[in-house]
Amino acid sequence: MRLGVMLGYFGAGTTAAEQLELVREAERLGYDSAWVAEAYGSDAPTVLAWLAAQTSSINLGSGVFQIPARSPAMTAMTAATLDQLSGGRFRLGLGLSGPQVAEGWHGQRFARPLARTRDYLTVVRMALERRRVAYQGETLELPLPDGPGKALKLTITPAQQRLPIYLAAMGPQNLALAGELADGWLGFLFSPEHAGGFRDQLAAGAARAGRDLDGFDIAPNVQVHISDDLAAARDVMRPFLALYIGGMGSRERNFYADQAGRYGFEQAAAQVQDHYLAGRRAEAGAALPDELIDLVTLCGPPAKVREGLAALRQAGVGTLITAPTAWTHTDRLTQLRQLAELAA
């Protein structure tokens, strides 16, 4: 099991120098990859290009590029450029974001998300393979049929023969799509106890493409806080989990609350949402059951975290994308180092 580090959103509570120090320390410690996110602040590719110029061996991934933010052709152009600049170290992670960001920020309808994702990934793959892009799907047609557009192919070649594409997915149908079209799955709120079900969904999609999961990378993003004080470690996790389960999306459409519900915490997730959407963030965090926190994070004493790492390996995780969670940069570096020791 390879270790990755999630940097999250650039500039959100950390400086550029701190982000760079974290990545360079991860590279020194032998971490396999560093991942950068985007929402409606910093963009991921600019940060990734900056990191590529200041690192030498660590792989760099988008976690994720938002599908509504770019045409598939622009995503392929960006990915190929980053792969060349990094010397073949780029991993392309894609995700739909959510209806609030897609429609409120990017002006893109969130309708037919499965069909749109299928069309998008198919065109990105065609472009990265330097095939002439002539495609007719349910939500996308290239070239447009009623104008002067012509089928084009990418004029540059990625450094890697097959640039790996990862899909962020949570629901069963999206997982199957990842298994069918992608090289890896970016999981979130990942439970090792439910890994068998995840693998079944991924395998069903892979079978549609006439393949199995051999070489497919299961790569969940997992929050980490190592501390001898278990209660304090759980409390570090509460604001982050409450944000996603309670506040990411609307009451009617929150993928993270849905995931908690699939794990058997539907009532607790509803309580977290009630508090969070009413502005009671501390109460939202307090409503998170300890059992849910332990299920989807690595937190607590070293022995407990070591057991969690073993469970993730047993669950078939190929790349564990860790998010060292702490209130200061110094503490984040400490978490990064401690985890490397425990995973060795």
What are these regions (language model features)?
Residues M1-A344:
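Active-site-adjacent structural elements that line small-molecule/cofactor binding pockets in enzymes
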